[in-house]
């Protein structure tokens, strides 16, 4: 009976450590790194995002055999739209693929690249994210 209780406590302690082993990230901290070494990808998690994580790369370093990309936690902005990369010099309204805005009543989303607080390229599309004003 004592061995059984000790085993249960051991399992509970292991679960507690594994679920709370990482501290919450501060906004300026690197949350995790993706390391690609000779085609093999691994992740080094440094802290836990409080919110649903959004891949926001902050730095990329390369040497002969390794590429390391560092990511921070970031909340998705309320207004996002995408453009095909070959049309970035054109006005964003003419070439917008999809606009997704959830601004509060009475607010609107800035919709020009100069007002973007962030832009990301995935494939052949550049996505801008904006704050509501």
Swiss-Prot record:
Family statement drawn from the similarity comment of this UniProt entry: Belongs to the scoloptoxin-11 family.
Annotated source species: Scolopendra morsitans
PTM notes: Contains 10 disulfide bonds.
Signal sequence annotation: 1-19
Tissue occurrence: Expressed by the venom gland.
Any one GO CC term of the record: extracellular region
Listed GO MF terms: toxin activity
Alphabetical keyword list: Disulfide bond, Secreted, Signal, Toxin
Main location: secreted
Protein name as annotated: U-scoloptoxin(11)-Sm1a
Subcellular location field: Secreted
